[in-house]
């Protein structure tokens, strides 16, 4: 089994919503958690990311499945950073991961209208 982390470095806060829409995340949320101004909250499409990341913050969404060119079951999206740099991390498990599958996932993101380049995407995986 492989643990896979797809890390996307973002410098524009508007890209967060674009990535969530691209992956169809809002319809697949099992649970989520964001903490802002000493308040626990669930994900909402109305989150003001500029306000949320005015101080270093982290939130996550646990998804039943996510679409990254193909469906991936049981994924976690971690959104962490501050107003200058955000890490949008997608974690999931797979029995195997070929270079072709990695490239398909990266190309799905790169071919969208989102302002992300190949150098902004890092794929990390470990076998266990």
Please annotate each region the language model reported:
Residues 23-61:
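Small/polar-rich, solvent-exposed N-terminal microdomains that initiate assembly or binding
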Residues 1-35, 125-127:
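Short, extreme N-terminal segment that most often corresponds to the first beta-strand
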Residues 50-128:
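Charged interaction segments
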Residues 11-15, 31, 45-48, 97-101:
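Alpha-helix capping and helix-coil boundary motifs
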